[in-house]
UniProtKB/Swiss-Prot annotation:
The keyword Calcium applies. GO terms for molecular function: metal ion binding; transketolase activity. Keywords: Calcium, Magnesium, Metal-binding, Thiamine pyrophosphate, Transferase. It comes from Halalkalibacterium halodurans (strain ATCC BAA-125 / DSM 18197 / FERM 7344 / JCM 9153 / C-125). CDD domains: TPP_PYR_DXS_TK_like, TPP_TK. Binds 1 Mg(2+) ion per subunit. Can also utilize other divalent metal cations, such as Ca(2+), Mn(2+) and Co(2+). Catalyzes the transfer of a two-carbon ketol group from a ketose donor to an aldose acceptor, via a covalent intermediate with the cofactor thiamine pyrophosphate. The record marks H28, H262 as: Important for catalytic activity. It catalyses: D-sedoheptulose 7-phosphate + D-glyceraldehyde 3-phosphate = aldehydo-D-ribose 5-phosphate + D-xylulose 5-phosphate. NCBIfam families: tktlase_bact (TIGR00232). GO terms for biological process: pentose-phosphate shunt. The gene is tkt. This is Transketolase.
Length: 666
């Protein structure tokens, strides 16, 4: 292909981006204008992908971590033949379009990850690279490299200022993820102005210290130098950072190289001058020259041929390794093996076990029948009970290991989990103390937004943590996560509810699940022995009916359910008929029919007392105007857990007193 056509193809990306932002009167033109050459080079000369099948298993992954530059990605998707029409580019940032302001996974064909919150794209790419290495180590055989793709990312200065990218880059270097290549759009400009006001470190030295291969391209418009750098990166066994020096808003005579081109349309006059600088002789907006369209058609055809070659290889693989191939297909489709849950542990009345421990037993049981179960903890596996026994650690020396040591990198763990789930082929879990869920909350939010079935194991879920004190005792976290759309929060009351929660989490294909688990032992509840799965799946159920017509409902989740049962028994001795409702999952309960809700929370029983060792926020919906809540609306304290619970009123005596007061005030 001639240099002239290459330059024309690059400028087509630029002008499509400019025109789309201009028409929307909203957006970020500067980044696509500066980064177009590196993106063009990557997408047309290196990336293995088939626009006709965006879900090809062994495609190279591309993440635009600098998601504000979304028109760069949309232009490439359209030009290379993905199902994204020119009309969609013209409807950039409009209601109902496939071209939202920031890329959204599942919304636009070819978009691999929802990005925009800076830094997370880098960390998700690390997760994708981890998934690729694990699946390659698990399924590849001599002569059959069915998983051997690269993960490419384009990021900006803002991405590399974010802490999550530092956490993830540290992990990637440690794991020697050589199939991850990060192209850094280094333009020395941030939204507020020149970068030197806030960022002056040597990114090159920092990434070398992480264990990365680093190369610098001085001229971001030099396609040959960019290609040479990518070739070097592919040949290196370490993850690679390619710093490409660019000019934001390249070509704009008055706004190029300035922050003013970052997040606003150029304006009609500047657009005209910019296109003249590109020697763009076409008058129509959104114009694609014929020779450019013809070139991109060749790229599309090459992608189809690459997938066809892979399909032929996989057909041979299926003949040589039928069982392995079947397992691989099941995993990449997100399905579970037949009979996988037959190994589920169960607990009898009389046995006490912390839900973190029953969770660990469930995890280990299901790991035997679900080989794609993969994950770990942010340096708390022994406390979270998330070690898969008998399995190796995932490491630079053994990528087949299923136990991931994320280190004390909660945010990177959450984002990497998203990347693994986006990659496909794995059932992913990650763990930490519940109070530290705040550290990865932005990643949880993206998981919910992308509808990714990742599993969070959050242990040490209340003031019962005890001696570690208020820094480690969650109070507001439960209400906070319940407020997040699309996230299923399950706080099981005993071992059987805990196992049911794991089953539901593993069965999910389109929703993340947070398991909120106790540190302290909890008794096995008689009402949950045979009904835990059905009850947890519906979010709430009558665990212990009243002895006769109910005078009072006791509502609780997690460790407080056994307290409610004990309070019920004390009340019954005084002739007060109370029913106990276990409410492990509000979001699941809200999805039930009105009839079922009435069955669990009969409207004629207005005396309702909720019991939960967390914020009272949200309980009013269930207890009503005549109800009450035993909760915690202050921070905890440092003392033995039993003493703290007593001081905060989580005793049978206090609950009974509150219940009787409630009935007296009716």
């Amino acid at each position: 292909m001639s240099k002239h056509v290459e330059q024309l193809a690059v400028n087509t990306i630029r002008t499509l981006s400019i025109d789309s932002v201009e028409k929307a009167n909203s957006g970020h033109p500067g980044m696509p204008m500066g980064a177009a050459p590196m993106a063009f080079c990557l997408w047309t000369k290196f990336m293995n992908h088939n626009p006709a099948n965006p879900d090809w298993v062994n495609r190279d992954r591309f993440v635009l971590s600098a998601g504000h530059g979304s028109m760069l990605l949309y232009s490439l998707l359209h030009l290379t033949g993905y199902d994204l029409s020119l009309e969609e580019l013209q409807n950039f940032r409009q209601w109902g379009s496939k071209t939202p302001g920031h890329p959204e996974y599942g919304h636009t064909p070819g978009v691999e990850a929802t990005t925009g919150p800076l830094g997370q794209g880098v960390a998700m790419a690390v997760g994708m690279a981890m998934a690729e290495r694990h699946l390659a180590a698990t399924y590849n055989r001599d002569g059959y490299n069915i998983v051997d793709h690269y993960t490419y990312t384009i990021c900006g200065d803002g991405d590399l200022m974010e802490g999550v990218s530092a956490e993830a880059a540290s992990l990637a270097g440690h794991l020697k993820l050589g199939r991850m290549i990060l192209l850094y759009d280094s333009n020395d400009i941030s939204l507020d102005g020149d970068l030197h006001h806030s960022f002056s470190e040597s990114v090159e030295d920092r990434f070398k210290a992480y264990g990365w291969h680093v190369v610098r391209v001085e001229d971001g418009n030099n396609l040959d130098e960019i290609a040479k750098a990518i070739e070097e990166a592919k040949a290196d066994e370490r993850p690679s950072l390619i710093e490409v020096k660019t000019t934001i808003g390249f070509g704009s005579p008055n706004k190029g190289g300035k922050s003013v081109s970052h997040g606003a349309p150029l304006g009609a006059d500047e657009v005209k001058l910019t296109k003249e600088a590109y020697e763009w002789t076409y008058e129509n907006e959104f114009h694609i020259p014929e020779e450019v369209a013809a070139y991109y058609e060749q790229v599309k055809q090459q992608g189809a041929e690459k997938e066809e070659s892979w399909n032929e290889l996989f057909a041979q693989y299926k003949k040589a390794y039928p069982e392995l191939a079947s397992q691989f297909e099941l995993a990449v489709h997100g399905d579970l093996p037949e009979g996988w849950d037959a190994v589920a542990p169960s607990y009898e009345v009389g046995k006490s076990v912390a839900t973190r421990s029953s969770s660990g037993e469930a995890l280990n049981a299901f790991a035997k029948t679900v080989p794609q179960l993969f994950g770990g903890s942010a340096d708390l596996a022994s406390s979270n009970k998330t070690l898969i026994k008998g399995e190796a650690n995932f490491s630079r020396d053994d990528y087949s290991g299923r136990n991931v040591w994320f280190g004390v990198r909660e945010f990177a763990m959450g984002a990497a989990m998203n990347g693994m789930a986006l990659h496909g082929g794995l059932k992913v879990f990650g763990a930490t103390f519940f109070v530290f869920s705040d550290y990865l909350r932005p990643a949880i939010r993206l998981a919910a937004l992308m509808q990714l079935p990742v599993i969070y194991v959050f242990t040490h879920d209340s003031i019962a943590v005890g001696e570690d004190g208020p820094t480690h005792e969650p109070v507001e976290q439960l209400a906070s996560l319940r407020a997040m759309p699309g996230l299923s929060v399950i706080r099981p009351a005993d071992g059987n509810e805990s196992v049911a929660a794991w089953k539901l989490a593993l069965e999910s294909k389109d929703q993340p699940t947070a398991l909120v688990l106790s540190r302290q032992n909890l008794p096995t509840l008689e009402g949950a022995v045979d009904r835990a799965y059905d009850g947890v799946s519906k979010g709430a159920y009558v665990l212990a009916p009243a002895n006769g017509s109910a005078d009072l409902l006791l509502l609780a989740s997690g460790s407080e359910v056994s307290l409610a049962v004990n309070a019920k028994e004390a009340l019954e001795k005084e002739g007060i008929h109370a029913a106990v409702v276990s409410m492990p999952s509000w979001d699941r309960f809200e999805a039930q029919s009105a009839e079922y809700k009435e069955e669990v929370l009969p409207s004629d029983v207005t005396a309702r007392l909720a019991i939960e060792m967390g914020s009272s926020l949200g309980w009013a919906k269930y207890v009503g105007n005549q109800g009450d809540v035993v909760a915690i609306d202050r921070f905890g304290a440092s003392a033995p857990g039993e003493r703290i619970m007593e001081e905060f009123g989580f005793t049978v005596q206090h609950v009974v007193a509150r219940a009787k007061a409630l009935l007296e005030n009716k």
